[in-house]
């Protein structure tokens, strides 16, 4: 693994194209709508800002956005886009990297919390966010629900994407809550492979992490359109809130 983590220049150069469906306005707009509402005129902090899929349209809606990003290559792609140079980006691990000021809302989308591959790092992330939030501020995470029940009995690998030129497999290690995503893509007639490790966490575990950081669960939905979260939900959008200042009489 290089300084840019698993998202080096080779990956960054094709990221937007490979995740094109995630840039569709039908996917992006509900995310931005909710974040604008939660920002309430304040600032937003994106952890794992990437190439700006959410940050750019959020900034276009008038919300001042700052980001943290481990990959310099991904951040360079953001800065090269219209409006990207107006968004401040701190390069570093979002579990520990700090930025100036406080924020009304901080957010992690598209399973990015799983990029932190230990429970210690995930707890540190919650605490880092809490330190950056204003009193009454919110932390939003979008992440998939672990799909262990969809694994065939005795199996540890499940396909998550299959097309003519790209396919992907998730490999689970239940004992460690580890998940490695194996991506295969045909490029110029050759098969390229990228394997990225993750750590999955159940919603209840994330709630406990928030509690350790002094935040409480405010909302949990099955998606950005505020669908109910049920036993059949494949992902959740959760909002934890930092306590507002207590006035002294």
Over which residues does each language-model region extend?
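Class I SAM-dependent methyltransferase SAM/SAH-binding core
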Residues: 51-96
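A short glycine-rich, Lys/Arg-flanked "PGG" loop and its adjoining helix->strand segment in the class I
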Residues: 123-135
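A short SAM/SAH-binding and catalytic strip from SAM-dependent methyltransferases
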Residues: 104-120
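SAM-dependent methyltransferase
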Residues: 140-211
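Conserved class I S-adenosyl-L-methionine
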Residues: 1-39, 41-50
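C-terminal lobe and adjacent flexible extensions of AdoMet/dcAdoMet transferase-like proteins
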Residues: 203-249
């Amino acid at each position: 693994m290089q300084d840019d983590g698993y998202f080096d220049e080779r990956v960054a150069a094709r990221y937007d194209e490979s995740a094109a469906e995630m840039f569709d306005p039908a996917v992006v707009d509900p995310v931005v709508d909710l974040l604008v509402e939660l920002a309430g005129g304040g600032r937003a902090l994106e952890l794992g800002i990437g190439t700006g899929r959410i940050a750019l349209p959020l900034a276009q809606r008038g919300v001042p956005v700052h980001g943290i990003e481990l990959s310099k290559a991904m951040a360079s792609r953001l800065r090269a886009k219209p409006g990207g140079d107006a968004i401040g980006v701190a390069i570093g691990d979002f579990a520990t990297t700090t930025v100036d000021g406080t924020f009304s809302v901080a957010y992690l989308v598209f399973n990015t919390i799983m990029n932190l591959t230990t429970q210690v790092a995930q707890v540190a992330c919650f605490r880092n966010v809490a330190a950056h939030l204003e009193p009454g501020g919110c932390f939003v995470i979008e992440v998939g629900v672990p799909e262990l029940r969809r694994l065939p009995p005795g199996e540890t690998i499940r396909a998550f994407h299959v097309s003519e030129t790209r396919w992907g497999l998730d490999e689970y290690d239940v004992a460690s809550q580890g998940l490695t995503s194996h991506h295969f893509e045909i490029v110029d007639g050759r098969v390229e492979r990228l394997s990225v490790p993750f750590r999955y966490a159940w919603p209840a575990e994330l709630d406990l992490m928030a509690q350790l950081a002094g935040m409480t669960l405010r909302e949990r939905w099955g998606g950005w359109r505020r669908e109910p979260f049920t036993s059949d939900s494949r992902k959740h959008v959760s909002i934890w809130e930092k306590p507002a200042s207590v006035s002294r009489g």
